[in-house]
Regions:
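Glycine-rich hexapeptide-repeat left-handed beta-helix
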Residues: 121, 133, 138-215
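Hydrophobic, well-ordered beta-alpha structural blocks that scaffold small-molecule cofactor pockets
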Residues: 1-32, 47-49
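Phosphate-bearing ligand-interacting subdomains
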Residues: 28-88
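Left-handed beta-helix
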Residues: 61-115, 119-129, 141-143, 147, ...
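Short amphipathic alpha-helical segments
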Residues: 3-8, 67-71, 113, 184-185, ...
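A general structural motif
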Residues: 18-20, 52, 76, 96, ...
Length: 215
């Protein structure tokens, strides 16, 4: 998908800005190719690349995303921000590096972004939102205004964050969840309203046990 994003960025300009040369992948042999281009090698090949190179790390797991970036030691590597031509960006006074903003995302005003965040299709980031590093927003996440989001959080498809909340670090918010309260760190939440997924499982097993006893 990010290779297609790069192609869209190039097509939107009179002069293409990027020369896409291929992929680096630890899990795919360099003898294999993707439809969009060749696999050039693994992270060891990347770390010994001899010339300047711009890369983007496109991984949907915050933990893995950070691990890969931490293991890239080549000083010739840089991390541009990639923004789809259809994305709407009103005002982002502060932005880091390596962010991926895909089609139909909307960013309004007075937003501060860290680095290496991935914003999938249709994500909405409104006024006065602060976002840290290595967060992954799946399609159609809706963040309300004046929200603080820390680092390494995973937001499921179509989840919603109500205004003025704080989301800590290393949280996993399930698809379709509605977050009505601030979240500390290292939580897995699910549902509307979003609650600890462990509590949901406990309630499920309680109901199942009760039904079995009734029989």
């Amino acid at each position: 998908e990010v290779a297609c994003l790069i192609e869209r960025i190039n097509k939107a300009r009179e002069t293409p800005i990027w020369n896409f040369i291929g992929f680096f992948d630890d899990g795919i042999p360099s003898t294999n190719d993707y439809p969009q281009g060749p696999v050039l090698g693994d992270i060891n090949v990347l770390n010994t690349w001899k010339t300047s190179l711009s890369i983007t790390v496109a991984i949907g797991s915050p933990k893995t995303l950070k691990s890969i970036v931490d293991n890239i030691a080549n000083k010739k590597i840089d991390y541009p921000n990639l923004v789809d031509p259809s994305a709407v960006l009103y005002e982002i006074p502060q932005i880091g590096i390596g962010n991926i903003i895909t089609a139909n995302c909307v960013f309004t005003t007075n937003i501060k972004l860290g680095s290496y965040n991935i914003f999938n299709i249709g994500t909405i980031i409104p006024h006065d939102v602060i976002i840290g590093d290595f967060n992954v927003f799946n399609p159609y996440v809706n963040v309300s205004g004046n929200t603080f989001i820390g680092n390494r959080n995973l937001f499921g498809v179509k989840c919603t964050i109500i205004q003025g909340k704080t989301i800590g670090d290393n949280n996993n918010i399930g698809a379709g969840s509605v977050v009505l309260n601030s979240i500390d760190s290292c939580k897995s939440l699910l549902g509307n309203p979003a609650i600890n997924s462990i509590l949901i499982l406990k309630e499920y097993f309680r109901i199942v046990k009760k039904e079995k006893q009734a029989k």
